[in-house]
Amino acid sequence: MRSRLLGAAVAAATVAGLLSVGVAGAGTRAETTVTITVQGRDFSGTVDSSRPLRCAKDRKVILYKQAGTVQDPTVDKKIASDVASLSSGKYRWSTGNTGIRGRFYARAPGTPECKADSSPTIHTTS
């Protein structure tokens, strides 16, 4: 009887250990990097990740017009959005001509598997 209880305890501890490893691994979200460029008032950029098929492919990117001195997606105005698609070996997004001047940044919101990222702020000059 004692050996049965000991065997059951070892089995339970093994299962608990495996479950905790699975949960810890599942909580690790991949880094994401968003870039932005502007030509005139045409915005475009790339999305990169260590897990490109999960975190760059078909990733939604939102273009914001920055209202204050720092980026704040809860306050800044959403101007356009696009979904990154593979082109010339990189996942690229583009909004086309927005017709708006100012300071802008692109943001890929976080997902359960991927961290959020925002590009640096850029200024349109023309």
Task: Label each residue range with its predicted role.
Residues 1-26:
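Secretory targeting and sorting signals
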Residues 26-34:
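Cleaved targeting-peptide boundary
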Residues 39-45:
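Structural beta-strand segments of beta-rich domains
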Residues 46, 87-97:
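Exposed aromatic-hydrophobic patches
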Residues 50-57:
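A short beta-turn/strand-edge loop motif at beta-sheet boundaries
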Residues 60-64:
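Beta-strand signatures of extracellular beta-sandwich domains
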Residues 74-89:
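Solvent-exposed serine/threonine-rich low-complexity stretches and specific carbohydrate-binding patches
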Residues 98-126:
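Enriched for extracellular/lumenal, surface-exposed ectodomains of secreted and cell-surface proteins
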